[in-house]
Amino acid sequence: MRRALIWLSSVVVATGAGAQGPPNTDVYLAPLTIEGGRPLIGPAVNVTHRIGYDNQPSFTANSRAILFTSVRDDGQSDIYRYDLTTKATTRVTSTPESEYSATVMPGGKRFSVIRVEKDSTQRLWSFALDGSHPRIVIAALKPVGYHAWIDANNLALFVLGRPNALVHTDVRTGRSDTLARNIGRSLAPLPDRSGFSYVHTVDSASVLAAMRWPARASRDLIALPRGSQDIAWASNDLVLTASGSKLLFWHSGDSAWSDAADLSAAGLTEISRLAVSPNGKWIAIVTVPK
């Protein structure tokens, strides 16, 4: 039985028979609109609604489904799909290995995952959208914790180490180089595809930064609220994050975060990962159920 687990509250993968079980988390889905530059969050619906680990949501390219990581009764970590129209959940991968952090690749025909292999090696793999035809994306680079596609040929990767490193890899050549160190798990392409964002530690604070590509010009944007480590881009100049039961937003040029919504009345607490659909109409929210 596979025991490799990526924790919600950590930026490393814990493996081995002695590892504790994964945290109990759920994925919620809510409508998202932007009015006057302010994000408005509609009623949030629990789309997983079960005891167990459901986490790491990302939307398909057509915004019609969510891919997410789920650990079920068999103890296996696989990728599942939730269809926004039919509200049906289907299993996408069912392998002897563990798959995490499903991300639809540029072109929309495959998705990439962090795969924990039988010998606990963590590398980047990809699958067809139906979970078939697995193949390795980068053979030499390991252990990979998280990733984001800058474009069809370039990847930004969180590589575990002391300290953790932000590594760029050109998938055409397999060549990799280190861009930064002491980074967090949140990596995301910029909405206009001009680069990507990452979070790194500056004077004990978690700071959101953006790197333009291919210029490799990086600049700090704003410090995240204390305890926050995840963000999602809602538009070219609007970022969302969470603190406790609250969603917060930041506009490019602002000096501080502003409140978007308090979801405590809906039972959403300890909000962590966020994902916004490509069409900007939906937000997926990971929370610890009451």
What does each model-identified segment do?
Residues 6-15:
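Bacterial N-terminal signal peptides
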Residues 19-290:
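Sequence signature of WD/YWTD-type beta-propeller architectures
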